[in-house]
């Protein structure tokens, strides 16, 4: 009988990526296969997120449900990973005796050894250290699961925004060597991947070592990835405005593989609140980035993150945020009511914004951005859009589903042979969460390939006297 593994994942795309690597790791080295049913599993892993409110309580509620399974099967192994594990450590075991393993985002590669320790009789195995880049050296070779793939290029964050736990739970910024990233993406391309999404808490801070001892910037990495045969689309998430430098903007001007869509968190449009958040920039500097981006890539669409009701946020501060939303014309957002994260500087600030007021502000903000997104979608009516076909439509398996450059799902009638390829469709209808298209042409009628020598990429390296992001030019 095959051994079964069940993984429950909460949180960001980095967590989704980590969970997929856990499955690959335990599948390759210990023969486990994934199951959707926790009751069937020999190992239960909970990959946690500490961003949202009451994250710890959510973990213990889930562990309470899993305890009933362990009561029936004492050999069941339960592990808790992710950011809550890093934050709470041994306190998880103290409160939930059913837990056998506690591991952080940087130690998931040690899971096989930790499982063996439990089997040998250790009552609790805890490893929430930050061994820098060792994690990636121990993971199995990448395995494609469709035409799109996520690739982690760095870990951690060194910005220490006053509201954020990431530097404390994932450590400071550590970049993977550029050669390792390029090799991983090339291997994925050989397996049919056409679009990669480069992941990190702050990808534009990427500074990866090269084989010759130099440092590869994020802008250079983007160009190297674009030159990999078979990779026709590149996305990345997430970025920080203070390191969105001109050399990155220049890539949008000359690298068509980089999509015309950017997620760039701003959190607030109020300079006073941005200062309290320790974001390191003002609203005008954010607008300067977007202005230069739109000069480099006409029609690029922008999404962002917003925190509503940060301690001390006044009606005037919120009005500044709404003004920024109108000025930029955001296409999408992840927006949340502020909740204090234990151990962060903002947790000590008096939370003097009424909850009902926070809810009203959130509803107003989300309604405005939804209206703007629908306006963009309606402008796409009658246009021809190139989409990467990801598979059957979710609601109608007789149809196909693809995604535009600006991250919209398009459903259309097409042949199964188009899955994993690019097609052009005409947009004929607009819905709240998707578009409808009519097939126009397949990939065999397109010219998608281009080549670029490494020397040409390095020739674009920014000069020492290049102006940084904090310089505003009207």
Curated annotation (Swiss-Prot):
It is found in: Cytoplasm. Residues 143-375 form the Radical SAM core domain. GO terms for cellular component: cytosol. InterPro entries: Elp3/MiaA/NifB-like_rSAM, Methylthiotransferase, Methylthiotransferase_CS, Methylthiotransferase_N, Methylthiotransferase_N_sf, MiaB_methiolase, rSAM, rSAM_horseshoe. Keywords: 4Fe-4S, Cytoplasm, Iron, Iron-sulfur, Metal-binding, S-adenosyl-L-methionine, Transferase, tRNA processing. Its EC number is 2.8.4.3. CDD domains: Radical_SAM. Residues 378-441 form the TRAM domain. Gene3D superfamilies: Methylthiotransferase, N-terminal domain, tm_1862 like domain. PANTHER family: CDK5 REGULATORY SUBUNIT-ASSOCIATED PROTEIN 1, MITOCHONDRIAL TRNA METHYLTHIOTRANSFERASE CDK5RAP1. Belongs to the methylthiotransferase family. MiaB subfamily. Monomer. Catalyzes the methylthiolation of N6-(dimethylallyl)adenosine (i(6)A), leading to the formation of 2-methylthio-N6-(dimethylallyl)adenosine (ms(2)i(6)A) at position 37 in tRNAs that read codons beginning with uridine. This is tRNA-2-methylthio-N(6)-dimethylallyladenosine synthase. It comes from Shewanella baltica (strain OS185). The lineage of its organism: Bacteria, Pseudomonadati, Pseudomonadota, Gammaproteobacteria, Alteromonadales. The gene is miaB.
């Amino acid at each position: 009988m095959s051994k079964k593994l069940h993984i429950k994942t909460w949180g960001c795309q980095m967590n989704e990526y980590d969970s997929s690597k856990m499955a690959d790791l335990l599948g390759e080295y210990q023969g486990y296969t994934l199951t959707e049913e926790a009751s069937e599993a020999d190992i239960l892993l909970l990959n946690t997120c500490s961003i949202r409110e009451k994250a710890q309580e959510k973990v213990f509620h889930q562990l309470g449900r899993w305890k009933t399974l362990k009561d029936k099967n004492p050999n069941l192994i339960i592990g808790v990973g992710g950011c809550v594990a890093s934050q709470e450590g041994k306190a998880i075991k103290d409160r939930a005796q059913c837990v056998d393993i506690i591991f952080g985002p940087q130690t998931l590669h040690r899971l096989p050894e930790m499982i063996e320790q439990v089997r040998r009789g250790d009552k609790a195995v805890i490893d929430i250290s930050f061994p820098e880049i060792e994690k990636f050296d121990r993971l199995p070779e990448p395995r494609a699961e469709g035409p799109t793939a996520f690739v982690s290029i760095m870990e951690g964050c060194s910005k220490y925004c006053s509201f954020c736990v990431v530097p404390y739970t994932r450590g400071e910024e550590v970049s993977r060597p550029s050669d390792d990233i390029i090799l991983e993406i090339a291997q994925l391309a050989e397996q049919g991947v056409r679009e990669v999404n480069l992941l990190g808490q702050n990808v534009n801070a990427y500074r990866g070592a090269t084989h010759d001892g130099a440092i590869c910037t994020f802008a250079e990495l983007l160009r190297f990835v674009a030159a990999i045969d078979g990779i026709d689309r590149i996305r990345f998430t997430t970025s920080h405005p203070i390191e969105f430098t001109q050399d990155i903007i220049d890539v949008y001007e000359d690298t068509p593989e980089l999509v015309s869509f950017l997620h760039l968190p701003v959190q607030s449009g109020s300079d006073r609140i941005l200062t309290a958040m320790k974001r390191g920039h003002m609203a005008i500097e954010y607008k300067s980035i977007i202005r230069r981006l739109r000069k480099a890539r006409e029609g690029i669409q922008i999404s962002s993150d917003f925190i509503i009701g940060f301690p001390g946020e006044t009606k005037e501060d919120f009005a500044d945020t709404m003004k920024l939303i109108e000025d930029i014309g955001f296409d999408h957002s992840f927006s949340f009511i502020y909740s204090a994260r234990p151990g962060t500087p903002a947790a000590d600030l008096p939370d003097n914004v009424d909850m009902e007021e926070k809810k009203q502000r959130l509803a107003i903000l989300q309604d405005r951005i939804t209206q703007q997104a629908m306006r963009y979608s309606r402008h796409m009516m009658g246009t021809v859009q190139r989409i990467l076909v990801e598979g059957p439509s979710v609601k109608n398996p007789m149809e196909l589903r693809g995604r535009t450059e600006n991250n919209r799902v398009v459903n259309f009638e097409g042949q199964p042979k188009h899955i994993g390829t690019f097609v052009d469709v005409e947009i004929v209808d607009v819905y709240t969460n998707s578009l409808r298209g009519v097939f126009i042409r397949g990939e065999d009628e397109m010219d998608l390939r281009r080549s670029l020598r490494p020397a040409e990429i390095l020739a674009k390296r920014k000069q020492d006297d290049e102006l940084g992001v904090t310089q505003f030019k009207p």
